Amino acid sequence: MKQLTGAQIRQMFLDFFKEKGHAIEPSASLVPHEDPSLLWINSGVATLKKYFDGRVIPQNPRITNAQKSIRTNDIENVGKTARHHTFFEMLGNFSIGDYFKEEAITWAWEFLTSDKWIGFDKELLSVTIHPEDEEAFTIWHEKIGVPKERIIRLEENFWDIGEGPSGPNTEIFYDRGEAYGNDPSDPELYPGGENERYLEVWNLVFSQFNHNPDGSYTPLPKKNIDTGMGLERMTSIVQNVPTNFDTDLFMPMIGATESISGEKYRSGDAEKDMAFKVIADHIRTVTFAVGDGALPSNEGRGYVLRRLLRRAVRYAKKLNMNRPFMYELVPVVGEVMKDFYPEVLEKKDFIAKVVKNEEERFHETLHDGEAILAEVIAKAKEEKTTVISGVDAFRLYDTYGFPVELTEEYAEEAGMTVDHAGFEAEMEKQRERARAARQDVDSMQVQGGVLGEIKVASEFVGYGTVATESNVVALVKNGEYTDSLQAGEEGQLMLDVTPFYAESGGQIADSGYLLTDGVKVLVKDVQKAPNGQNLHKVVVEEGVLTKDATVKAVIDTKNRSSIVKNHTATHLLHQALKDVLGTHVNQAGSLVTAERLRFDFSHFGQVQADELEKIERIVNEKIWESIDVEISQKAIEEAKEMGAMALFGEKYGDVVRVVQVGDYSLELCGGCHVDNTASIGIFKIVAESGIGAGTRRIEAVTGKAAYELMNDQVSLLKEAAGKMKTNPKDILTRVDGLFAEVKQLQKENESLAAKLSNIEAGNLTDAVVSVDGINVLATKVNVADMNNLRTMMDDLKNKLESAVIVLAAVNDDKVNILAGVTKDLVGQGYHAGKLVKEVASRCGGGGGGRPDMAQAGGKNPAQVDEALAFVQEYVKSVSK
């Protein structure tokens, strides 16, 4: 068997099947752009479904690929077992109605055993087949020459996911030798059993039947081949190492973690080994996922990334790493994978920035969680219980992102346990709340009453017209059918033809009037009815509106004009965000009204002022270029091939509406737009903010609203200049002068504060007491913040030379605590970090730090004196 790297095995596989007439399909993005309902690409065949289901005919029916994949159904097993991963590569060869079993089996054997390729010893290979698959048995035994005793028949060798294509499969196993199992009484020690000796190398699926709705199976007219070989597992066999983690696909990340942590992999500590494995696996997943456009967040694929990073940070604590470090591994992943995935190194700076940002956020959360947990433990001790309630554990998890496993570790240190059943009960309550929230989405109560019974058609013609003659085909009042609405009454109605746009895709509904002889009806809102028609919410202002009446339906054109300006502007904004911030930006929500637009998007940090200026400039330049906006109907596949942006979670039909702004923007959209960007006039960003981790929001105005906003800003500038007794053009110079004056005054104030602190520190030396021969000072002081506490601490250390000091200051019902230990006493075992943690816990807080200096916070000022009294107890305990 050859000595090969993981990269060489990958390339060798693709080269082999290229020689056999296969087209190499590029590895697709982990974010499945062609299937918005799928969270991740999770297999080699996932990106080829369009070929297997007949939607697209491949140019070559023989395909091979090396597909990056993510599976997260068993995250908790990663690191515990030899081969569980969240990110992996699947090597595969596929036949779309071309070759079948004989070629698939023959080529698999050739690749594995030929000296030109992998060069496995044939005697170490065994295969499994379905008991009724005599064709596979004949090929394996008579053509390939595998002895009968190494062909195992297993009932589970049948690939079936319910209705649709299905068929038997054959798996190839490699015998790693007696070192991995030699107990003849082990019932699982056989190819296909649960053991470490016989490892599955390759799975060949023969899709030859259709599983019918009645449970029967009938032969497929065109038979397919779908195979899968896990690169990581194959590499572990070729490199003769005990686990996938010991291959060159993982060891560089493990080695880098060793250097950062100072700990050693495979040092005999199973917990530390698991930590190394978790970190190596999870950084691969996060690196590739972020590179493909996913960002940490609280839902969907972003939540998966957040969970993986937090799990890695938790395990890093076992390696004594309490700072952000995962981001340092990103370029290491890039180097390992650069031969086949050069884009990772190209994007490494961006990916590392995202990872570091998320790590820093979680370390802040951990600190907050530790403080809350200290309160929970103290409360439990007061109540004389040794169990942390499920409610408290869930609050730590849900509010502070505090893993329950970490809560358990702290509880164990305090001689306590966690109520797991209570925790799971709280988790289930949250799931129920989420399920209920998802079901409660019927705006205007359009899902209730008789509306679901209305099947009459209603055609929307509002893209091309603003007024039309229509018939009232359904009239509803208080959830029931009615024949008429009187003046002053409200109701809901449907028209056979309507120019009124129903709220959808972030665009609000049109408003306007229905007019006929002596009747005037205000259309206040329009929503989609249960069966898809436009449902108009109306109030009769004059006359009596009757069912079957013929009316003139007229939208408010001034209102619509403002709406379409803002809607087209969101498309320009979306593309400008991608241009300036990066291709990871994706729409996360929008609101388009007549007054303003709001656009939510994925991004890991605040958008900087200069970036906002660039974004605004780009949008305005596209407006001033007077670009035509073209709208067309396209087949979904054609639209995607054109590069049209689709939204995650949206369901699209076979034919979609494509909105194209020149060669700049291309999106699938059902909304209303301007004919030319010049109609927008001007675009002005009003605000940028964060609305959740990984999601930002931009609010903006266009046209007249933008002009009025800028006019107001100019007026404000003039008013400010007047108050500063200067001209608007000189206001910056005036402000700079004022800042310089303030800075000088602050400097003088700080100097006075330092002198006062020094005087107070001198007075405090009288409060020093001797405890077992150690100078101890534990007292409250009157200072404004932690900086002044540090200054005072430095003065006291210099004056006392040898002492244990704890200072506490109360401001705005909060307690700042600072502990200091002089160098000579640090050497005797006194530790400021441990001391301040204990003191803070006694006044409702937490903290920590170095042996010589540490800080903490507390929430109960009334308990400060009691907390400070503990300092003498601590000194006595150490001096014993």
Curated annotation (Swiss-Prot):
This is Alanine--tRNA ligase. SMART domains: tRNA_SAD. It holds the Pfam family tRNA-synt_2c. Zn(2+) binds at residues 567, 571, 669, 673. One of its GO terms (cellular component) is cytosol. NCBIfam families: alaS. Consists of three domains; the N-terminal catalytic domain, the editing domain and the C-terminal C-Ala domain. The editing domain removes incorrectly charged amino acids, while the C-Ala domain, along with tRNA(Ala), serves as a bridge to cooperatively bring together the editing and aminoacylation centers thus stimulating deacylation of misacylated tRNAs. CDD domains: AlaRS_core (cd00673). Its EC number is 6.1.1.7. The gene is alaS. Keywords: Aminoacyl-tRNA synthetase, ATP-binding, Cytoplasm, Ligase, Metal-binding, Nucleotide-binding, Protein biosynthesis, RNA-binding, tRNA-binding, Zinc. Catalyzes the attachment of alanine to tRNA(Ala) in a two-step reaction: alanine is first activated by ATP to form Ala-AMP and then transferred to the acceptor end of tRNA(Ala). Also edits incorrectly charged Ser-tRNA(Ala) and Gly-tRNA(Ala) via its editing domain. Its cofactor is Zn(2+). It is found in: Cytoplasm. GO terms for molecular function: alanine-tRNA ligase activity; aminoacyl-tRNA deacylase activity; ATP binding; catalytic activity, acting on a protein; transferase activity; tRNA binding; zinc ion binding. Belongs to the class-II aminoacyl-tRNA synthetase family. Binds 1 zinc ion per subunit. InterPro entries: aa-tRNA-synth_II/BPL/LPL, Ala-tRNA-lgiase_IIc, Ala-tRNA-ligase_IIc_anticod-bd, Ala-tRNA-synth_IIc_core, Ala-tRNA-synth_IIc_N, Ala-tRNA_ligase, Ala_tRNA_ligase_euk/bac, DHHA1_dom. GO terms for biological process: alanyl-tRNA aminoacylation. It is an enzyme of class 6 (ligase). The keyword Protease does not apply.
